[in-house]
């Protein structure tokens, strides 16, 4: 479209957003790899005992927010080569309903953006860990990686690429006017104030310097 209409294009990589896989607090199985997730949305895995690290038995259901959401597009494009999702996958209508469904059903895996993992609704504090939540956050592993290297979606593992379920957030503007609300908003998001707004949603800024500190426990 941009080329067809000869529109100027401004584009910028803003942040990295990760998806978390969540399960019921009573579910002992909190480990999964990307290939198993792919087989779930292909309808090849429909029961918990089919997982390599699975210890429980029974039907396995995967729930997400809405059929036309960015979550579904990510799973289709990044995990399933653009094909529709199959098997025991169900839309709940919203991320809040996904979390509620997981809290009520031990056989369910929920897919939500990490921004929805909060101790209290409306809280903007970045979590240092996920252990105080009403749900459990699964460890996710890349195919071929040792199980000791599987991770949860903490910002450090998003930044290093060790957590696999990550997407890039871009902003695009094609407004040809040099002074417009759209262009002003574009530069606002790139500036420090806009970056602080994005960072408050638990998304990792592309220009963030991730600090690594060694901790010695005595």
Task: Pin down the residues of each PLM region.
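Exported/periplasmic ABC-transporter solute-binding proteins
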Residues: 1-17, 22-218
């Amino acid at each position: 479209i941009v080329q067809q209409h000869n529109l100027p294009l401004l584009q910028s990589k803003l942040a990295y957003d990760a998806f978390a896989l969540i399960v019921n607090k009573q579910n002992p199985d909190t480990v999964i790899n990307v290939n198993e997730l792919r087989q779930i949305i292909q309808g090849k895995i429909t029961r918990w005992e089919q997982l390599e690290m699975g210890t429980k038995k029974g039907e396995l259901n995967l729930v997400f927010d809405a059929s036309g959401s960015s979550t579904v597009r990510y799973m289709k494009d990044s995990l399933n080569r653009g094909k529709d999702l199959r098997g025991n996958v169900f839309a709940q209508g919203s991320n809040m309903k996904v979390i509620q469904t997981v809290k009520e059903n031990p056989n369910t895996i929920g897919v939500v953006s990490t921004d929805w993992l909060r101790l209290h609704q409306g809280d903007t504090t970045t979590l240092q860990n996920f252990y105080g939540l009403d749900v459990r956050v699964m460890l996710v592993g890349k195919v071929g990686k040792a199980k000791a290297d599987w991770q949860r979606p903490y910002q450090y593992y998003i930044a290093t690429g060790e957590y696999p379920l990550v997407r890039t957030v871009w902003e695009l503007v094609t407004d040809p006017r040099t002074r417009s609300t759209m262009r002003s908003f574009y530069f606002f998001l790139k500036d420090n104030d806009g970056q602080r707004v994005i960072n408050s949603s638990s998304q990792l800024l592309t220009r963030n310097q991730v600090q690594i500190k060694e901790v010695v426990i005595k």
